[in-house]
Each structure stands twice: as C-alpha cells, then as structure tokens.
C-alpha cells in the first residue's frame, strides 16, 4: 500500500518541481546525463569527473594542446544554472556548451556540482561553490594537496583565474567574487575576471520595464531555495541593490562581462547591475553584451543558432 506521505505534495514550483511530504523531490526540467570524454571528443577536448569533497564534485575540461607539455592556460571555475534546484555539470546542455567554449577559448574549466535545493537549501550552494574555488586555488601553493589534479598543476595559469555562470550560476559567480573581496583564497590567489550570463537577480521593487507577472516565478523560486533568507527577496545574495548590500566596488576581479537577452525576464536587472558596477567606483573594466530577440538560456536550447555562436565567441574572447 502506498503511504499517504509519499503522494502528498507539500510545495511545488511549477513547471520545475514538486516536493512531497516524505521529502521526495520530483524534478521535471532536468536535461539528460552526458558522460565525460576522457579520450577527447571531436574537437579534441578532454573531460573527466572528480570528487573535491565527499559532498562536492566537478567536471573538468582540458582543450587540445600543442606538443609543449608546459603550456599554461587560463582557468574558469564555472557554476551551472537551474534556479539552484535543477541541472548539473553532467547534463547534456551544460556539457555541450562547455565543450564548445573550451575548444574555442583554450581554457581549463572546472564545472562545479554544488548541492541543490530544496534538499540542501541555500546558502549550501554558495558554501559548496566557495569550497570548490578554494580547492582550485590550493593548486597555487607549495603545500602538497592530497587531492590535487594534474591538469591544474601542469597546465593552470593562476594569474588568469576566472569565475563564470549562467542564470543562478551567474548569481553564484557574483556572490563568490564579492566574498573573495573579504576572504582570502589559498596562495593569495586573485580572480582575474568574472562573466555573468543572464544573471538571476531579483527584488521587491520593480526596475525598468519589469512586470509583476515576470517576477512571480523568480520570487517563488528564491523563497523555495532559500526559505530562511533574511530580508526574503531583498536579501543581498539575490538583490545586490537592496538596502544593506555591500558596495559593488568590492567585487574582487579586474574584468567583468555581463550578458543579457532582450526577451529574458532577467534583462532589466542585468542592465541595472552593469550600470551599478560602473557607478560604484570599481576600478576594473566592465562590458555589457546585449542579445536581441532571444529569451532566457537561448544558447543552451538553440545551440547552433548564430546568436548562440556569437555569445560563445564573445565569451571566448573575454576568457582568452
């Protein structure tokens, strides 16, 4: 006999997921799993899965290299999107995207598998992401690391360390870059640049041409994934413009790339973020890239479109 606890829905975030009374989470929008390519794919990009801690894993990417074994490459620590509650580095959408980005930009990528809400509500994803970044930075020290990775040791250029992400992953990249402004990374490693692609920010007050209808799912998602957030939807982690937020001039990097799409409900916040950084007194270089006629995550779902290719080209240029 099926227990009533297993079929009673206690919360839902449609069309994304349902949570049942017994703690089971049913996800509807996860994309299929894609295996790594330890022997390389058609572009010569190698990939492998590693464990950083018992709770945190990652997929690493290495581009096709010249015969020189000492070739040093920029490093991108990447955080996937999915509203903090779906997707992973091992999904076909993420894997395909990063394979292309690595082949074009010739970088090492560490794609972080942070734990997901609602089983692990925020700030767990932020904590996992910071721990993963510290693990990467630990390769930039003379101290022996028992879990060091040979790709990072042999080929990583720690003077060209980047963070990046899409949607909620861009939110993580922003918050981790802010944390790096106050907390020291191993080896005093510095973040060279950050890219935020269609970043997931929100707030109680409308900005620009935002509408309440567009914001409803964004707000509901935040309250599901971070139910104990102080200030709710105006917590500084989701609303970097809210009262009490740290000044954006404290973001710890030299270069910043922000991408927005004209049909994305997050577009107004992305543009506002770009302007706020410029006006904050931050000393780095910030660039805004607008994609016309496209919606949220277009480059994942229409992978072969000219605009998706243009975005990847712009990111590759930023990361090189």
Regions from the PLM with identified roles:
Residues 2-320:
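Alpha/beta-hydrolase superfamily serine-hydrolase fold, recognizing
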